[in-house]
Design a protein with these regions (language model features):
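Patatin-like phospholipase
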Residues: 1-43, 51-327, 336-339
Length: 339
Protein backbone atom coordinates (compact mmCIF):
# COMPACT_ATOMS: atom_id res chain seq x y z
CA UNK A 1 0.00 0.00 0.00
CA UNK A 2 1.27 3.49 -0.88
CA UNK A 3 2.70 5.61 1.92
CA UNK A 4 1.06 8.88 2.98
CA UNK A 5 3.13 12.05 3.22
CA UNK A 6 1.28 14.40 5.57
CA UNK A 7 2.78 17.87 5.98
CA UNK A 8 -0.26 19.97 6.94
CA UNK A 9 -2.87 19.54 9.69
CA UNK A 10 -6.18 21.35 10.19
CA UNK A 11 -7.91 21.05 13.58
CA UNK A 12 -11.41 22.43 14.11
CA UNK A 13 -12.88 23.65 17.37
CA UNK A 14 -15.11 21.35 19.37
CA UNK A 15 -14.91 22.15 23.08
CA UNK A 16 -14.47 19.16 25.35
CA UNK A 17 -14.93 16.84 22.41
CA UNK A 18 -11.39 17.85 21.52
CA UNK A 19 -10.27 14.89 23.65
CA UNK A 20 -11.11 12.85 20.54
CA UNK A 21 -8.12 14.51 18.90
CA UNK A 22 -5.87 12.94 21.54
CA UNK A 23 -6.91 9.43 20.53
CA UNK A 24 -6.47 10.36 16.87
CA UNK A 25 -2.97 11.66 17.60
CA UNK A 26 -2.03 8.40 19.29
CA UNK A 27 -2.77 6.53 16.07
CA UNK A 28 -0.91 9.11 13.96
CA UNK A 29 2.11 8.74 16.27
CA UNK A 30 2.05 4.96 15.78
CA UNK A 31 1.87 5.38 12.00
CA UNK A 32 4.70 7.93 12.03
CA UNK A 33 2.48 10.47 10.27
CA UNK A 34 3.31 13.46 12.50
CA UNK A 35 7.06 13.56 11.89
CA UNK A 36 6.74 15.52 8.62
CA UNK A 37 4.24 18.11 9.87
CA UNK A 38 5.38 21.64 9.03
CA UNK A 39 2.10 23.61 9.14
CA UNK A 40 -0.90 23.45 11.50
CA UNK A 41 -4.05 25.55 11.13
CA UNK A 42 -6.48 25.37 14.04
CA UNK A 43 -9.25 26.91 16.09
CA UNK A 44 -10.20 26.80 19.78
CA UNK A 45 -9.40 23.41 21.37
CA UNK A 46 -7.71 22.53 18.08
CA UNK A 47 -5.24 25.36 18.70
CA UNK A 48 -4.47 23.95 22.15
CA UNK A 49 -3.82 20.51 20.65
CA UNK A 50 -1.67 22.14 17.95
CA UNK A 51 0.68 23.35 20.69
CA UNK A 52 1.00 19.77 22.00
CA UNK A 53 2.11 18.64 18.55
CA UNK A 54 4.39 21.62 17.93
CA UNK A 55 6.27 21.21 21.21
CA UNK A 56 6.80 17.49 20.53
CA UNK A 57 5.00 16.28 23.65
CA UNK A 58 4.67 12.51 23.79
CA UNK A 59 1.18 11.04 23.69
CA UNK A 60 1.64 9.98 27.33
CA UNK A 61 2.48 13.56 28.32
CA UNK A 62 -0.56 14.86 26.44
CA UNK A 63 -2.90 12.37 28.09
CA UNK A 64 -1.45 13.24 31.49
CA UNK A 65 -2.26 16.92 30.91
CA UNK A 66 -5.85 16.07 29.97
CA UNK A 67 -6.50 13.78 32.94
CA UNK A 68 -4.87 16.16 35.44
CA UNK A 69 -6.70 19.21 34.10
CA UNK A 70 -10.16 17.85 34.77
CA UNK A 71 -9.40 17.51 38.50
CA UNK A 72 -7.88 20.99 38.82
CA UNK A 73 -10.47 23.18 40.59
CA UNK A 74 -8.67 26.31 39.44
CA UNK A 75 -9.33 25.27 35.85
CA UNK A 76 -12.70 23.53 35.94
CA UNK A 77 -14.68 25.13 38.78
CA UNK A 78 -16.01 28.70 38.64
CA UNK A 79 -17.48 29.78 42.01
CA UNK A 80 -20.64 31.87 42.33
CA UNK A 81 -18.60 34.84 43.55
CA UNK A 82 -17.15 35.10 40.04
CA UNK A 83 -20.53 35.85 38.45
CA UNK A 84 -19.97 39.59 38.82
CA UNK A 85 -17.05 39.19 36.40
CA UNK A 86 -19.48 38.88 33.51
CA UNK A 87 -20.09 42.61 33.95
CA UNK A 88 -16.71 43.78 35.22
CA UNK A 89 -14.41 41.47 33.21
CA UNK A 90 -16.78 40.32 30.42
CA UNK A 91 -16.30 36.68 31.40
CA UNK A 92 -16.60 34.30 34.36
CA UNK A 93 -12.91 33.40 34.33
CA UNK A 94 -9.73 33.75 32.31
CA UNK A 95 -8.50 31.25 29.74
CA UNK A 96 -4.95 32.19 30.80
CA UNK A 97 -5.33 29.67 33.64
CA UNK A 98 -5.37 26.87 31.06
CA UNK A 99 -2.36 28.27 29.28
CA UNK A 100 -0.45 28.64 32.55
CA UNK A 101 -1.17 24.96 33.24
CA UNK A 102 0.34 24.00 29.88
CA UNK A 103 3.35 26.28 30.39
CA UNK A 104 4.11 24.62 33.72
CA UNK A 105 4.15 21.26 31.95
CA UNK A 106 6.31 22.61 29.14
CA UNK A 107 8.82 24.06 31.61
CA UNK A 108 9.71 20.50 32.64
CA UNK A 109 10.60 19.56 29.07
CA UNK A 110 11.94 22.97 28.04
CA UNK A 111 13.20 24.92 31.11
CA UNK A 112 14.21 27.90 28.95
CA UNK A 113 10.72 28.45 27.48
CA UNK A 114 8.71 31.30 28.97
CA UNK A 115 7.08 32.76 25.89
CA UNK A 116 7.52 32.19 22.16
CA UNK A 117 6.39 34.13 19.10
CA UNK A 118 5.18 32.58 15.87
CA UNK A 119 8.57 33.31 14.30
CA UNK A 120 10.48 31.76 17.21
CA UNK A 121 8.32 28.62 17.16
CA UNK A 122 8.93 28.21 13.44
CA UNK A 123 12.69 28.63 13.83
CA UNK A 124 13.05 26.36 16.85
CA UNK A 125 10.47 23.62 16.19
CA UNK A 126 10.03 23.81 12.42
CA UNK A 127 6.25 24.24 12.55
CA UNK A 128 4.28 27.21 11.21
CA UNK A 129 1.09 27.79 13.24
CA UNK A 130 -2.16 29.45 12.14
CA UNK A 131 -4.70 30.23 14.89
CA UNK A 132 -8.22 31.34 14.01
CA UNK A 133 -9.82 34.05 16.20
CA UNK A 134 -12.74 36.47 16.09
CA UNK A 135 -11.90 40.17 16.37
CA UNK A 136 -14.71 41.70 18.42
CA UNK A 137 -13.87 45.30 17.51
CA UNK A 138 -14.01 44.62 13.77
CA UNK A 139 -16.51 41.71 13.89
CA UNK A 140 -14.34 39.62 11.59
CA UNK A 141 -12.05 36.63 11.51
CA UNK A 142 -8.34 37.04 12.04
CA UNK A 143 -5.75 34.30 11.69
CA UNK A 144 -2.55 34.79 13.65
CA UNK A 145 0.45 33.34 11.82
CA UNK A 146 4.15 33.68 11.08
CA UNK A 147 3.29 35.57 7.88
CA UNK A 148 0.86 38.09 9.42
CA UNK A 149 1.86 38.26 13.10
CA UNK A 150 5.42 36.91 13.44
CA UNK A 151 6.11 38.73 16.72
CA UNK A 152 2.88 37.83 18.55
CA UNK A 153 3.04 35.18 21.30
CA UNK A 154 1.66 31.82 20.19
CA UNK A 155 0.32 31.35 23.72
CA UNK A 156 -1.62 34.63 23.66
CA UNK A 157 -3.01 33.89 20.20
CA UNK A 158 -4.04 30.42 21.36
CA UNK A 159 -5.83 31.96 24.35
CA UNK A 160 -7.75 34.24 21.97
CA UNK A 161 -8.66 31.27 19.78
CA UNK A 162 -10.08 29.41 22.82
CA UNK A 163 -11.93 32.21 24.66
CA UNK A 164 -15.64 31.35 24.61
CA UNK A 165 -17.75 34.51 25.21
CA UNK A 166 -19.14 34.98 28.74
CA UNK A 167 -17.37 31.85 29.99
CA UNK A 168 -13.93 33.38 29.40
CA UNK A 169 -12.79 37.00 29.28
CA UNK A 170 -11.78 38.36 25.85
CA UNK A 171 -8.07 38.53 25.03
CA UNK A 172 -6.50 41.93 24.35
CA UNK A 173 -3.91 41.98 21.55
CA UNK A 174 -2.51 45.22 20.14
CA UNK A 175 -5.41 47.28 21.47
CA UNK A 176 -8.21 45.05 20.13
CA UNK A 177 -10.24 42.26 21.73
CA UNK A 178 -10.53 38.68 20.55
CA UNK A 179 -12.78 35.69 21.20
CA UNK A 180 -12.97 32.09 19.98
CA UNK A 181 -12.69 31.78 16.19
CA UNK A 182 -15.82 29.59 15.98
CA UNK A 183 -17.97 32.64 15.27
CA UNK A 184 -16.01 33.47 12.14
CA UNK A 185 -13.91 30.46 11.05
CA UNK A 186 -14.15 27.27 13.07
CA UNK A 187 -12.38 25.16 10.44
CA UNK A 188 -9.55 27.25 8.92
CA UNK A 189 -8.68 25.00 5.99
CA UNK A 190 -8.83 27.59 3.20
CA UNK A 191 -5.48 28.97 4.25
CA UNK A 192 -4.02 25.78 2.75
CA UNK A 193 -5.98 26.04 -0.51
CA UNK A 194 -2.74 25.94 -2.51
CA UNK A 195 -1.62 22.67 -0.86
CA UNK A 196 -2.46 19.28 -2.37
CA UNK A 197 -5.15 17.53 -0.34
CA UNK A 198 -2.93 14.45 -0.46
CA UNK A 199 -0.64 16.21 2.03
CA UNK A 200 -3.36 17.39 4.44
CA UNK A 201 -5.22 15.74 7.29
CA UNK A 202 -8.22 17.91 8.17
CA UNK A 203 -9.94 16.97 11.43
CA UNK A 204 -13.49 18.14 12.16
CA UNK A 205 -15.44 17.58 15.38
CA UNK A 206 -19.02 17.77 14.23
CA UNK A 207 -22.29 16.47 15.68
CA UNK A 208 -25.77 16.80 14.23
CA UNK A 209 -28.19 18.77 16.38
CA UNK A 210 -30.38 16.67 18.64
CA UNK A 211 -34.13 16.99 18.27
CA UNK A 212 -35.61 19.61 20.60
CA UNK A 213 -37.47 18.22 23.60
CA UNK A 214 -39.76 20.75 25.38
CA UNK A 215 -39.15 21.21 29.11
CA UNK A 216 -40.65 23.21 31.95
CA UNK A 217 -37.28 24.57 33.03
CA UNK A 218 -37.52 27.95 34.71
CA UNK A 219 -35.53 30.65 32.97
CA UNK A 220 -32.78 32.05 35.20
CA UNK A 221 -29.11 32.97 34.92
CA UNK A 222 -28.06 29.32 35.13
CA UNK A 223 -30.43 28.30 32.34
CA UNK A 224 -29.32 31.22 30.18
CA UNK A 225 -25.65 30.22 30.56
CA UNK A 226 -26.43 26.67 29.46
CA UNK A 227 -28.42 27.90 26.46
CA UNK A 228 -25.67 30.31 25.43
CA UNK A 229 -23.26 27.37 25.31
CA UNK A 230 -25.76 25.47 23.14
CA UNK A 231 -26.23 28.43 20.78
CA UNK A 232 -22.48 28.83 20.54
CA UNK A 233 -22.25 25.21 19.45
CA UNK A 234 -25.03 25.68 16.86
CA UNK A 235 -23.17 28.66 15.38
CA UNK A 236 -20.00 26.59 15.27
CA UNK A 237 -21.66 23.67 13.47
CA UNK A 238 -23.49 25.87 10.98
CA UNK A 239 -20.33 27.78 10.17
CA UNK A 240 -18.44 24.55 9.52
CA UNK A 241 -21.05 22.77 7.42
CA UNK A 242 -22.19 25.68 5.26
CA UNK A 243 -19.07 27.75 4.69
CA UNK A 244 -16.07 25.46 4.89
CA UNK A 245 -16.77 21.86 3.91
CA UNK A 246 -16.45 20.84 0.28
CA UNK A 247 -18.50 17.83 -0.77
CA UNK A 248 -15.90 16.80 -3.34
CA UNK A 249 -13.28 16.55 -0.58
CA UNK A 250 -15.40 14.67 1.96
CA UNK A 251 -13.29 11.52 1.69
CA UNK A 252 -10.27 13.50 2.83
CA UNK A 253 -11.88 14.86 6.02
CA UNK A 254 -11.49 13.11 9.36
CA UNK A 255 -15.02 13.59 10.67
CA UNK A 256 -16.10 11.13 13.41
CA UNK A 257 -19.86 10.66 13.13
CA UNK A 258 -20.79 8.76 16.29
CA UNK A 259 -19.83 11.31 18.93
CA UNK A 260 -21.72 10.49 22.12
CA UNK A 261 -21.07 13.66 24.14
CA UNK A 262 -24.23 15.73 23.70
CA UNK A 263 -22.70 19.20 24.12
CA UNK A 264 -19.23 20.51 23.32
CA UNK A 265 -19.19 22.36 26.65
CA UNK A 266 -20.36 19.84 29.23
CA UNK A 267 -21.11 22.15 32.16
CA UNK A 268 -23.02 21.96 35.41
CA UNK A 269 -24.53 25.27 36.53
CA UNK A 270 -26.08 25.65 39.98
CA UNK A 271 -26.07 27.94 43.01
CA UNK A 272 -22.54 26.85 43.92
CA UNK A 273 -21.16 27.97 40.58
CA UNK A 274 -20.18 26.57 37.20
CA UNK A 275 -18.27 23.32 36.77
CA UNK A 276 -16.75 21.98 33.56
CA UNK A 277 -17.82 18.36 33.90
CA UNK A 278 -15.74 15.59 32.34
CA UNK A 279 -15.31 12.13 33.85
CA UNK A 280 -12.44 9.67 33.43
CA UNK A 281 -14.83 7.35 31.64
CA UNK A 282 -15.78 10.04 29.13
CA UNK A 283 -12.10 10.80 28.50
CA UNK A 284 -11.33 7.09 28.06
CA UNK A 285 -14.22 6.64 25.63
CA UNK A 286 -13.32 9.68 23.53
CA UNK A 287 -9.62 8.74 23.32
CA UNK A 288 -10.55 5.21 22.23
CA UNK A 289 -13.09 6.53 19.73
CA UNK A 290 -10.58 9.00 18.31
CA UNK A 291 -7.99 6.22 17.96
CA UNK A 292 -10.31 3.76 16.20
CA UNK A 293 -11.85 6.45 13.98
CA UNK A 294 -8.40 7.63 12.87
CA UNK A 295 -7.36 4.04 12.13
CA UNK A 296 -10.35 3.66 9.79
CA UNK A 297 -9.68 7.07 8.25
CA UNK A 298 -6.01 6.35 7.51
CA UNK A 299 -6.97 3.05 5.88
CA UNK A 300 -9.35 4.96 3.59
CA UNK A 301 -6.70 7.56 2.78
CA UNK A 302 -4.20 4.84 1.85
CA UNK A 303 -6.78 3.21 -0.42
CA UNK A 304 -7.49 6.56 -2.09
CA UNK A 305 -3.77 7.11 -2.68
CA UNK A 306 -3.35 3.58 -4.02
CA UNK A 307 -6.24 3.96 -6.46
CA UNK A 308 -4.99 7.36 -7.59
CA UNK A 309 -1.50 6.02 -8.29
CA UNK A 310 -2.91 2.92 -9.97
CA UNK A 311 -5.00 5.08 -12.30
CA UNK A 312 -2.05 7.35 -13.05
CA UNK A 313 0.25 4.42 -13.87
CA UNK A 314 -2.41 2.78 -16.02
CA UNK A 315 -2.70 6.03 -17.94
CA UNK A 316 1.04 6.16 -18.51
CA UNK A 317 1.05 2.56 -19.71
CA UNK A 318 -1.73 3.38 -22.15
CA UNK A 319 0.21 6.30 -23.54
CA UNK A 320 3.25 4.08 -24.12
CA UNK A 321 1.18 1.54 -26.03
CA UNK A 322 -0.31 4.25 -28.23
CA UNK A 323 2.99 5.95 -29.03
CA UNK A 324 4.54 5.24 -32.48
CA UNK A 325 8.20 4.17 -32.83
CA UNK A 326 10.56 6.90 -33.99
CA UNK A 327 11.55 4.84 -37.07
CA UNK A 328 10.25 1.84 -38.98
CA UNK A 329 12.30 -1.25 -38.14
CA UNK A 330 9.86 -3.84 -39.45
CA UNK A 331 11.93 -4.67 -42.54
CA UNK A 332 15.62 -5.40 -43.05
CA UNK A 333 17.46 -2.48 -44.56
CA UNK A 334 18.79 -2.99 -48.09
CA UNK A 335 22.54 -3.56 -48.41
CA UNK A 336 24.57 -0.67 -49.79
CA UNK A 337 25.99 -2.87 -52.60
CA UNK A 338 25.19 -6.13 -54.35
CA UNK A 339 27.35 -8.94 -52.99
Amino acid sequence: MDKLNITHLVLSGGGMRGVIFIGALRYLYIEGLLKNITHISANSIGSFVALFITFKLSIEEIEEIVYNSKDDKELCVIPTKNYYRIISKLGLCSITNFMAHLKRRLSIKYPDIDDLTFKEVSQRFGVNLYFSTTNINRCENRIFSIEETPDISVFTACEASMSIPLIFTPILIDGEYYYDGAFSNNFPIKIFSNISKENIIAMILYKERDEYVPTNTKINIFYILRQICKMFEILRVRQVTINELKSEDKDYYFMPRNITMQHSMNIIVNRKGVKLDLSNQQIDEMILYGFSSMADYIDRRKELLYEKNKTRLAGLAGLEEQSEPLCDTSEQSEPLCDT
